Design a protein with these regions (language model features):
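Membrane-embedded transmembrane alpha-helical bundles that form the catalytic cores
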Residues: 1-426, 430, 434-473
Length: 474
């Protein structure tokens, strides 16, 4: 079930609100949310609810087991086993197809194609990357002594399966919400802020991201070698806007929904496209994922405490894992290593040059160029496609398609507005930024804007069937 669907907006969510707010008993409210979350997940993939329940049970029992141990050696063995089993589940469903494709490619190259592996493709359960990482953070935190093992399996189940952030994040760490599960308050101010945040996120998705997505997908269906330089750049820029409004829009909706039920989730985006370095970009983009990798991979590897060379290696390992987490494909791995390489280069000295540069505009141009080129790898179906698009971008080609074939005044207007709303307008006018994230809705204009946005999005849903979420693939 999608947040941006009529069923969710006008059936599921009102029903959950009604059942949730007819009682003030927190245990009953948690039961309502857990039941709703399982139903939400089962709506699209009923059989994979069992997989999620297995994950919940696995991590619950390992958490209890680790929490009762006295021997550090046994605790380490138990947490290693649990992490392995979690990654085994994730690896089987997400990376098995990719592994077989690699094996067949190697067999074809070195064995002449005489022997290849036949297999039935395994479907990817929606949200498995997100809830697996949440479960891992719980078990590791119990092992580290950061938190106590949760004895109530229903509380842990709600943490892992909570529908606002189940499908596409933010990745919530257990120690950030464990107290909220057991004790939280729902206020009128929180509800108002949550509705406003959800409405803005829905508008980002429906009015901006979907418009850009339709154009980008149409362009990707054409022979890429015949796009021409102008269209290739237009494709890259529109996808850059699409993925930001798609993913940040979903995060806004998730944060807003959580607030409506009394939960405070961490911010996942902080205007990443106004960054002046790639290092800053990753402090602003998908914050919950980057902090997860920092806390559970980069620091355990040694972080930056074991010399420069080791730091560079650790960064490349983390961004290899970041790329692989996003998708089982060479394009995602290259995208991750590409960003990791620029982070290494910035640590080697480029970062200091950027800090000393008096012309900050050049820093913005550098960062924007690196990010836009990186998104080409992320969007391309194959490395060959990415190579063709990049060739079109950096060597002048006329192409056979006029730009007017792909864009119209609506797309151009939304693209310009999208660029402004990606951080430029908020930087120029800080009050706009404060307004978007203030915790109270006290003005009539806020209510009017929310009503208009919900109406426009509903009309869009009624008239259109195009409604993909990029991060649902992960």
């Amino acid at each position: 079930m999608l947040f941006s669907s009529l069923v969710f907006l006008w059936c599921f969510l009102p029903a959950v609100f009604f059942l949730y707010f007819i009682t003030k008993n927190l245990h009953i409210r948690n039961s309502v949310l857990l039941t709703a979350s399982l139903f939400f997940y089962a709506w699209g993939e009923p059989k994979y609810v069992i997989l999620m329940l297995v994950s919940i049970g696995l991590n619950y029992f390992f958490g209890l087991w680790i929490g009762r141990m006295q021997s550090k050696h046994r605790m380490r063995l138990a947490v290693t086993t649990c992490v392995f089993l979690n990654l085994l589940l994730l690896g089987y469903f997400k990376y098995f197809n990719f592994a077989v494709e690699i094996a067949n490619s190697l067999l074809s190259r070195f064995a002449g194609g005489a022997h290849t592996l036949s297999f039935r493709e395994i479907a990817l359960p929606v949200g498995i990357s997100f809830y697996t990482f949440q479960a891992l953070s719980y078990v590791v935190d119990v092992y580290r002594g950061t938190i106590q093992a949760q004895k109530n399996i229903f509380h842990l189940a709600l943490y892992i399966s909570f529908f606002p952030q189940l499908i596409a994040g933010p990745i919530v760490k257990y120690h950030d919400v464990c107290e909220q599960i057991e004790n939280r308050q729902c206020t009128a101010e929180g509800m108002a802020y949550g509705i406003k945040r959800f409405s803005y996120g829905l508008a980002k998705k429906m009015l901006f991201a979907n418009t850009f997505a339709a154009t980008v997908d149409w362009m990707m269906e054409k022979p890429l070698a015949q796009l021409g330089t102008v269209n290739a750049w237009m494709l890259a820029v529109l996808y850059t806007l699409q993925i930001y409004f798609d993913f940040s829009g979903y995060s806004d909706m998730a944060i807003g929904l959580g607030k409506m039920f009394g939960f405070d989730f961490m911010e996942n985006f902080n205007y990443p496209y106004i960054s002046t370095s790639i290092r800053e970009f990753w402090r602003r983009w998908h914050i919950s994922l980057s902090t997860w990798f920092r806390e559970y991979l980069y620091i355990p590897l040694g972080g930056n405490r074991k010399g420069q060379v080791r730091t560079y290696v650790n960064l490349l390992i983390v961004f290899f894992a970041t790329g692989l987490w996003h998708g089982a494909g060479a394009t995602f791995i290259i995208w991750g290593l590409y960003h990791g390489l620029f982070l290494v280069v910035e640590r080697m000295g480029l970062g200091k040059l950027l800090e000393k540069n008096c012309f900050r505009g050049l820093n913005h141009i550098y960062t924007a160029l690196v990010v836009v080129v990186g998104w080409v790898f992320f969007r391309a179906d194959t490395l060959a496609d990415a190579k063709v698009i990049l060739h079109q971008m950096f060597t002048w080609e006329n192409g056979i398609y006029p730009a007017s074939l792909f864009v119209n005044p609506k797309v151009i207007f939304l693209a310009v507005l999208g660029v402004l709303l990606s951080g430029i307008a908020q930087s120029i006018c800080p009050k706009l930024r404060e307004h978007l994230y203030e915790k109270e809705v006290t003005k009539t204009v806020d209510i009017v804007i929310m009503a208009v946005l919900l109406f426009l999005c509903t009309m869009y849903l009624v008239s259109s069937t195009y409604n993909p979420f990029i991060y649902f693939r992960f």
